[in-house]
Every structure is written in structure tokens, then in C-alpha cells.
Regions:
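Secretory targeting and sorting signals
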Residues: 1-36, 40
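NAD-dependent ADP-ribosyltransferases
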Residues: 7, 36-247
Length: 247
């Protein structure tokens, strides 16, 4: 009897092991088993910066300069430098923009954008060291977002963007390409006015506050805090200056 009992137990144990081997595991049998998460998609890269010219360009046109300048005393220097540096002069009439953190908007409407000094610093040097130099150059841009960036650069992240309707100006990117100038700031898409811009060419100014910057694309979002219209805006009126004979 004992021998028969042992034999029966061996048969039962063998059957149990076979059943366990054939049974599915809990993980494979459960319909709610976790599925490995896919690898995260690579972050979107910021778009390449545009360093092309703003638009059509050509030879320097002194009449444009005489209409816009706030400092006619540097006319001879401007004319000579236009030749020696082979300025590529802006020939379109598209809107220009300038970012400014100063709060004296009404004064700027009246006085215009006057340069910090009279020195015609070489353009190749000016476009590397920036607008804080004591020079006759005054910067604008053909891209509104660039002006917004400069206007909100300070700690307050708030500033004014001026809308400008003025003829001429040096297309910095076109001139840099022709002369092989190098600068990390060609994304500024700058139109430079040697001698400044009269206030009558400023159409309006709007105040912007930087609210956020996308961490991946670096694109900024701004809040418009309001605009001021320049009652002296008269871009079609002649400057009333007698242009001296060319020498």
C-alpha cells in the first residue's frame, strides 16, 4: 500500500509541474500589463537666423540722406565714406522699426533719432561693437521682432517699438556681404542711417512687455501695452534743405 501511495504522489507532482509550465505568466496574461513608453521625440531646433539683405539695394543716393538726416554738417564725410565703404543703399520703401527703452516718446517724435556723435566709425567696426558707440550711425531694422527684442532687453522687459517710414539707409547685410565684413549680429537685419532720422518720419510708437520665451524655439511672446501716434508724421514733406553741389 505504501508503495502504491508513493507512486500516486509522483504522478500527481509530475502533472502539476507540467501544468505550471504551460500556464501563461501573470504579466503576459493580463490585458493591463504596462507597455514600454516610446523614446521621446527630439526637441525642435530653433529656425536658422536670416542674415540676407532686407531688400533691393543700389548706389548711395544723397537726396535720401539730405531728407532724413539730423546732422547736415557731416555731409562731406558721409559722401566720401559711402564710396570708400561701397555702401549698399536701401532702395525700397518698406516699413522700418527701432526698439528703444527710453520713455521720452514725445521728445523723440519731435527731435527724431539723433546719433550719439559725429564720428563716422567704419561700418565693419560699428556692426561688431554695437550701437553704444559714440558715432554718427543710427540703427533700425526691417524686422519688427528684432526691434521688439531690443526694446524689451532690459531688466524691466518693457520698451517702445517705433514704426518708421523713411527713405534710404545703408543695408548692412548687403554691404557686409559685398565687402566680406563679419559680424555675429547680422540677424539684426539692420538698416543704418548715418546722421540720424528726422522725427517727421516716425509714424507711431507702441509699448511692449516680454511675457515669455519658448525654451526650444526661443520665440518671444509680447503684450502690447498701448501705442502713441506722432502728430508730426509728415514723410512726404520736403526737408527744406538746399543740397550743395557735388564736388
Amino acid at each position: 500500500v505504501l508503495t502504491m501511495l508513493k507512486a500516486a504522489l509522483r504522478v500527481l507532482a509530475t502533472a502539476t509541474l507540467a501544468t505550471a509550465a504551460l500556464a501563461p505568466t501573470a504579466a503576459s496574461a493580463s490585458p493591463t500589463a504596462p507597455i514600454p513608453a516610446p523614446a521621446p521625440a527630439p526637441a525642435a531646433a530653433a529656425p536658422a537666423l536670416d542674415t540676407a539683405p532686407c531688400g533691393p539695394v543700389g548706389a548711395y543716393r544723397s537726396w535720401d540722406w539730405w531728407r532724413t538726416t539730423t546732422n547736415p554738417l557731416i555731409a562731406d564725410t558721409v559722401r566720401e565714406t559711402a564710396v570708400s565703404e561701397r555702401w549698399q543703399w536701401r532702395h525700397d520703401t518698406n516699413t522700418l522699426w527701432r526698439g528703444d527703452t527710453r520713455e521720452n516718446v514725445t521728445d523723440l517724435f519731435e527731435q527724431g533719432f539723433t546719433p550719439r556723435g559725429d564720428a563716422m566709425i567704419p561700418l565693419a567696426e560699428y556692426i561688431v561693437k554695437g550701437g553704444g558707440q559714440n558715432s554718427a550711425h543710427v540703427s533700425t531694422t526691417c524686422e519688427k521682432w528684432v526691434a521688439q527684442k531690443f526694446a524689451t532687453y532690459g531688466a524691466a522687459k518693457t520698451g517702445w517699438v517705433y514704426e518708421i517710414d523713411a527713405p534710404g539707409g545703408i543695408d548692412v547685410n548687403a554691404t557686409a556681404a559685398l565687402n566680406r565684413y563679419e559680424s555675429p549680429y547680422l540677424w539684426n537685419k539692420e538698416i543704418d542711417f548715418p546722421g540720424g532720422i528726422e522725427g517727421r518720419y516716425i509714424k507711431q510708437a507702441c509699448k511692449f512687455h516680454l511675457t515669455k520665451t519658448d525654451p526650444q524655439t526661443k520665440v518671444n511672446t509680447y503684450e502690447n501695452l498701448g501705442c502713441k501716434t506722432n502728430e508730426r508724421f509728415r514723410p512726404e514733406r520736403q526737408a527744406g534743405l538746399e543740397m550743395p553741389a557735388q564736388r
